[in-house]
Swiss-Prot record:
Organism: Pectobacterium atrosepticum (strain SCRI 1043 / ATCC BAA-672) (Erwinia carotovora subsp. atroseptica)
Parts of the chain that traverse the membrane: none
InterPro entries referenced in this protein's UniProt entry, alphabetically: Ribosome_maturation_RimP, RimP_C, RimP_C_sf, RimP_N, RimP_N_sf
Protein's name according to its UniProt entry: Ribosome maturation factor RimP
Matches recorded under SUPFAM superfamilies: YhbC-like, C-terminal domain, YhbC-like, N-terminal domain
Keyword hit for Transcription regulation: no
Length: 152
């Protein structure tokens, strides 16, 4: 099973239990390595505490133990999205129009995979980012990773 299919299956599997606890499932990442990690990002209107993460971890662990979708050993991490919030869906980009974002593409555009710019617009599955005064349009399916860039 390829990584995006696994992440999609995991998202479908744990969305309801996370929502039942009163949290939004922001997204998940599965990082394959010698010590693989399943990272789950949650949020709520009141913010996220360590106890919230522990509650979700306990609930999700129970679901994953029964369903057993991951065939390798892994560590489970549950956290808030944090200041460098990852963006997973078109709705996330739409919510953060006007914010600076760092994007890594699956396939290079204009010989570049890494882009830094401001989210300008979202049209279906197409994301427009203003980079150095020029609008660049990327398919959401070509975005491997995107994070907000915090300013202090």
């Amino acid at each position: 099973m390829d990584l995006s299919t696994l992440e999609q299956k995991l998202t479908e599997m744990i969305s309801a239990p996370v929502a039942a606890l009163g949290y939004e499932l922001v997204g998940i990442e599965f990082i394959r390595s010698r010590q693989s990690t399943l990272r789950i990002y949650i949020d709520s209107e009141d913010g996220i505490t360590v106890d919230d993460c522990a509650d979700v971890s306990h609930q999700v662990s129970a679901v994953l133990d029964v369903e057993d979708p991951i065939t390798v050993a892994y560590n489970l991490e549950v956290s808030s999205p944090g200041l460098e919030r990852p963006l997973f869906t078109a709705a996330h980009y739409l919510h953060f129009v006007g914010e600076e974002v760092a994007v890594v593409l699956r396939m290079a555009v204009q010989n570049r995979r890494k882009w830094l710019g401001v989210i300008k617009a979202v049209d279906g599955e197409m994301i427009t980012i203003t980079v150095e005064g020029k609008d660049e349009v990327f398919a959401l399916s070509n975005i491997q990773k995107a994070n907000l860039v915090p300013h202090f």
